[in-house]
Amino acid sequence: MRTVDVIVAGTGGMGTAAAAHLARRGAGVLALDRFPPGHARGSSHGQTRLIRLAYFEHPDYVPLLRRARGLWRGLEQDTGSRLLVECGLLASGPAAGDVIAGTLRSAAAHALAVERMTAREAMGRWPAFRIPDAWESVFEREAGYLAVEACVRAHAEVAGRRGAVIEADHDVRGWRVEGNGVVVETSRETVSAGRLVLCPGPWAADLVRLPAVPFTVLRKSLFWYAPAAGLAPAAAAALPAFAFDTPRGFWYGFPMLDGRGLKIAEHTGGRVAADPLDVDRAIDPAEQAAVEGWLADHLPGVGRTRTDHAVCLYTMSPDHHFVVGLHPEHPQVALAAGFSGHGFKFASVIGEILADLALDGTTRLPAGFLAPGRFAEHVAGRDP
């Protein structure tokens, strides 16, 4: 039986980041997954992910985001990769809605630079958008996007360079605590380690073993469309990223990159995926109609020429906040799961937190609000 310092189960966005941070600290790391890093069967693919500091979900995330940004920039320098692009983010919606009110709350709490504007002012700056007069818009200049597959590859590169072993074709079937360590069963072998880091993505329900935390996997569609005659390609490429809080759901998208078209997706909604390995990846006509309806309402210069489509998976926690910390019953096990469709931007700092927890049993980073014990404790009045 192979024995290592730390086993990382999962090599998506979080697992490769954890492997990189652990290897940097000198740990002997074995990272295992069914698929190789950068695969398109989980939650870490699809060209881009938003990154923003004025975080409407909760102000407590902002210190982690600041650290994450610095780590992404450091990873760029370490690998010579272009990972984080600051194209700005335009958020629009009702002033009292979760997106605008939450964005402004985080900006005020952490003295973040954002620009408030009326719908007319926003459309004056970016004429491609159509925004109802009653809405408010907030522009965050330093927001932008991460090149998601490149980020995963960069962390895997750093991990390998520092001595970590990353292996695919391992279906991680279970784990057990033995003495002060952990034994992991895969489809190929049994491996032991002093510590286990769980980054299972949509397989969280099978591997995390937290009865108080029911995870739900949602199938989400991503669409790319070419600009039409009313929107020149150069103008489409110069748009900011965008997030619209509409009566028909919360939608987001990106400027046109590499001639592929503009990426648009609905953050809300989605169908439950009972088996992450058996997901319908065909285009759903109802989803396509919804996307094209959103485009007609808010970005009419984008035509109806679909250039690409992909499906990714959200792993939802009960409160839609991350589940990151030591396992409540097994301190040999650190875990990161339930990112609920808004986690990738944090991968760099989540990897650091997981390395701290695995090697030190604690972390100086302010991540206690994400600990799995919050579900068992039923603490009232705390959000999250």
Language-model features: where?
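Short beta-strand to alpha-helix junction loop
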Residues: 63, 91-99, 138-157, 279-287
